[in-house]
């Protein structure tokens, strides 16, 4: 019996997808779960729904469990490939299920183990200081307080930095992070909402893991061949950077997902929704601001003046709804924590220009002055303007994501801090450019077919008219 092509992937498309999934497994597996924080914690007590995981690892961090799950993901991929080789096709529903299983097996086990270990010891163990602080910020919001300008020196967070749960006066006085909360308001607001989830799943990393996995179905919002969309979506959700971010505790995934949704809504001409999604992305992470001019140009190319005004009002309204409560509470603390802290107060970290200058002796102190503002004005801003101009000239939406990838990478490089986890942003933007390219190619193909069909019908009608006149 013949199989309709819209119900199954052909052999080549299916094997391309499965090859991409296999590559993700192979890239992730050797380093999965490596280089955690060096906690000197007591063995975790098995508690609650995650007790089996804690028992399986003897109450400690065990990368072998994560790698076993990744190996299982590889086996699932291999079995699916064998089925394709035998049958010559892969049902579309089966392709979605296989991709989802592989992504889940790569992303979720590490997060669940970390949360189980944390619940069996103390909140300052088996977590990252940033997500621990986000959890605390969510509690403050639920209690009607602002997390900006708050003194975290006696919140429990101070016990994280010794890695054994102890605390010293020096830590409380010297650790700058205990006096600042660096995230835009969307993060504490989302943490406040997520904190209502029953324990132990109220850990913010569970939310991060879920939205990380959600990048896979988000890729299906774009148009194009299913196999290619699933491959790019799986890379968005389960790249080594995204997988590590989920269990280690860096909270970029919610903002990245919102940005992916924003671009998907642009290509679907849901312009008001795209503007709202961009605003949500910015509320969740400052880095999304860099995408604003690129997405604005993409919106302007598709919108009437009235629709563009409506999108602008929606964007401003969503931002205002997120920022205003904290501006009213303490505008100075909000600015000091989210803008000044990252640009001028935080110590120099990482492999960017600041780190290179520090190692070369040009900068003497990690806390010393660094001309970030001048570099941003002289280097990053002109480059971004050129990229936006190139996007405007090209008329193709995928160049917006490509331009954003280049712009944000340069911004990271010239900043005081260049964490490797930041690379998830240019990587996601590059994959997003691929999804946008597929969407535009599919759209142009449909337009060409429609034009050809219209011309054919018009030609046939014209010929019939001549024939009728000839008979007359």
Locations of regions flagged by a protein language model:
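Transmembrane helices and adjacent periplasmic/lumenal helix-loop junctions
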Residues: 272, 276-300, 321, 416-422
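Transmembrane alpha-helices of multi-pass inner-membrane enzymes
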Residues: 423-441
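Membrane-interface transmembrane helices that cradle and orient dolichyl/undecaprenyl
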Residues: 259-273
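Short, intrinsically disordered terminal tails adjacent to the first/last structured region
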Residues: 1-11, 440-472
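Generic transmembrane alpha-helix motif of multi-pass integral membrane proteins
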Residues: 261-263, 278, 294, 411-412, ...
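A periodicity- and composition-biased signal for non-globular, repetitive helical segments
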Residues: 211, 291, 422-425, 452-455
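Primarily membrane-embedded glycan-assembly and transfer machineries that use lipid-linked glycans
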Residues: 2-96, 105-263, 299-420, 433-434, ...
């Amino acid at each position: 019996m013949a199989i309709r092509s819209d119900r199954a992937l052909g052999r080549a498309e299916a094997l391309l997808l499965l090859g991409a999934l296999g590559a993700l497994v192979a890239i992730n597996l050797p380093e999965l779960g490596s280089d955690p924080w060096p906690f000197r914690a007591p063995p975790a007590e098995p508690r609650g729904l995650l007790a089996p995981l804690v028992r399986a690892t003897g109450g400690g961090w065990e990368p072998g469990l994560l790698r076993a799950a990744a190996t299982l993901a590889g086996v699932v991929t291999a079995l699916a490939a064998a089925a394709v080789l035998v049958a010559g096709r892969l049902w579309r529903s089966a392709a979605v299920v296989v991709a989802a299983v592989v992504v889940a097996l790569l992303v979720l086990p590490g997060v669940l183990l970390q949360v189980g270990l944390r619940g069996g010891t103390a909140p300052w163990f088996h977590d990252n200081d940033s997500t621990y602080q986000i959890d605390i910020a969510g509690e403050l919001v639920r209690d009607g307080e602002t997390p900006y300008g708050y003194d975290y020196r006696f919140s429990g967070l101070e016990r994280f930095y010794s890695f054994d749960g102890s605390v010293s006066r020096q830590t409380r006085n010297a650790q700058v992070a205990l006096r600042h909360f660096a995230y835009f308001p969307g993060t504490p607001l989302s943490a406040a909402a997520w904190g209502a989830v029953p324990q132990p799943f109220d850990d913010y990393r569970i939310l991060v893991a879920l939205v990380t996995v959600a990048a896979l179905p988000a890729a299906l919002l774009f148009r194009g061949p299913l196999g290619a969309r699933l491959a790019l979506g799986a890379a968005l959700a389960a790249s080594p950077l995204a997988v590590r971010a989920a269990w280690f505790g860096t909270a970029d995934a919610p903002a990245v997902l919102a940005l992916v949704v924003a671009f998907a809504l642009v290509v679907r001409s849901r312009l008001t929704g795209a503007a709202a999604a961009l605003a949500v992305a910015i509320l969740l992470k400052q880095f999304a601001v860099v995408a604003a001019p690129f997405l604005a140009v993409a919106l302007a190319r598709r919108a009437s003046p009235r629709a563009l005004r409506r999108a602008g009002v929606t964007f401003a309204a969503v931002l205002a709804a997120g920022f205003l409560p904290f501006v009213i509470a303490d505008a100075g603390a909000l600015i000091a924590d989210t803008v000044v802290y990252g640009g001028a107060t935080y110590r120099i970290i990482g492999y960017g220009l600041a780190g290179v200058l520090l190692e070369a002796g040009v900068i003497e102190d990690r806390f010393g002055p660094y001309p970030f503002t001048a570099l941003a004005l002289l280097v990053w801003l002109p480059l971004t303007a050129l990229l936006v101009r190139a996007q405007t000239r090209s008329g193709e939406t995928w160049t917006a994501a490509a331009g954003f990838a280049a712009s944000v990478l340069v911004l990271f490089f010239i900043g005081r801090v260049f964490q490797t986890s930041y690379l998830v942003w240019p990587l996601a933007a590059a994959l997003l450019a691929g999804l946008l390219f597929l969407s535009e190619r599919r759209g142009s193909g449909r337009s060409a077919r429609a034009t050809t069909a219209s011309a054919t019908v018009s030609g046939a009608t014209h010929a019939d008219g001549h024939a009728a006149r000839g008979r007359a």
